């Protein structure tokens, strides 16, 4: 039972990390770390899930507030309206 709980936490942590990378952009994250963007791609398959499990075992956890904030950011990005292309267009 404890292993299942730990795996669920690990999956939540891994998902949170991957979502944050997606929101910030893989290139920006790589630049901030001083590595090549392709390294981030390699990490996604192996390193990040292992780190998620390590953090879960250490009971690092994912805060509900962090997930809520992440959800708000994603929703904002998805609903962001584009400005009109032409200044002459007017809707009456």
UniProtKB/Swiss-Prot annotation:
GO terms for biological process: regulation of DNA-templated transcription. InterPro entries: Cro/C1-type_HTH, Lambda_DNA-bd_dom_sf, Transcrpt_activ_CII. The keyword DNA-binding applies. It comes from the Viruses. Keywords: Activator, DNA-binding, Transcription, Transcription regulation. Pfam families: Phage_CII. Coiled coil: none annotated. GO terms for molecular function: DNA binding. Residues 26-45 bind DNA. Binds to two promoters, P(RE) and Pa23 and activate transcription from these promoters. Homotetramer. Belongs to the lambda phage CII protein family. This is Transcriptional activator protein C1. The gene is C1.
């Amino acid at each position: 039972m404890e292993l299942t709980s730990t795996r669920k936490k690990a999956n939540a942590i891994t998902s949170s990390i991957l979502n944050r990378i997606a929101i910030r952009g893989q290139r920006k994250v790589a630049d901030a770390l001083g590595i090549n963007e392709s390294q981030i791609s390699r990490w996604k398959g192996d390193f990040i899930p292992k780190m998620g499990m390590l953090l879960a075992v250490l009971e690092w956890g994912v805060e509900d507030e962090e997930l809520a904030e992440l959800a708000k950011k994603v929703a904002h990005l998805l609903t962001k309206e584009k400005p009109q292309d032409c200044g002459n267009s007017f809707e009456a």
